[in-house]
Amino acid sequence: MDIGKVIKERRALLKISQQDLADYSGVGISTVKDLERGVGNPSIETLKKILDVVGLEMNLQVKQTIK
């Protein structure tokens, strides 16, 4: 899954600009642009701020292994 693509599609659906997303989430515009392009390495906290604005959440699961 490409989280940047998911965020970009959700942002477009909500009709908010990259600048609006940056402003509402309290992160820099370059962070939003980099994330949507699939570059950069945002922290979990930064991702959470952005996801909150677009109405998404992130869940972590323990990976099942085959023995």
Q: At which residue positions do the language-model features occur?
A:
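DNA major-groove recognition helix of helix-turn-helix/homeodomain DNA-binding modules
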Residues: 45-60
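Short acidic DE-rich linear segments
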Residues: 65-67
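Residues within the alpha-helical elements of helix-turn-helix
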Residues: 13, 24, 53
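Short basic helix-loop element that most often maps to the first helix and adjoining turn
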Residues: 5-20
